[in-house]
């Protein structure tokens, strides 16, 4: 699978997971309608389905996906919650993405 396709799929997967977790947060912590649980459940189902589209071992997918998830979570924090990430947050994202690149580019045994 081409790298840009994989990264795009990871980004979509992260958004689906974040939305699926953010909507119940709005209900539980911010007093929004319990009806938000319906789109949250659908979003988490899409998240699980998207994970199946990756062509490598699931453990490796989850590990590599984690780097993109951390990046998307910080972007969500900034865009949706209006909290600007600190320099150390971005440094952490860089470390996560470096780890993701190492996992994705590393040799495959068996």
Curated annotation (Swiss-Prot):
HAMAP family to which the protein is assigned, alphabetical: UPF0060 (MF_00010)
NCBIfam families: PRK02237.1
Parts of the chain that traverse the membrane: 7-27, 33-53, 63-83, 86-106
Name of the protein in its database record: UPF0060 membrane protein Bpet0062
Predominant cellular place of this UniProt entry's protein: membrane
Family of this protein: Belongs to the UPF0060 family.
Membrane-protein topology: Multi-pass membrane protein
A cellular component annotation (GO) from this entry: plasma membrane
């Amino acid at each position: 699978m081409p790298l840009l396709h994989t990264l795009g799929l990871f980004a979509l997967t992260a958004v689906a997971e974040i939305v699926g977790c953010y909507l119940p947060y709005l209900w539980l912590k911010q007093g929004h309608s319990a009806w938000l649980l319906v789109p949250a459940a659908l979003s988490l189902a899409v998240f699980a389905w998207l994970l199946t589209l990756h062509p490598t071992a699931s453990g490796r997918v989850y590990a590599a996906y984690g780097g993109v998830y951390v990046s998307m979570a910080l972007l969500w924090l900034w865009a949706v919650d209006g909290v600007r990430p600190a320099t150390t947050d971005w440094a952490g994202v860089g470390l996560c993405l470096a780890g993701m690149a190492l996992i994705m580019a590393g040799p495959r045994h068996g």
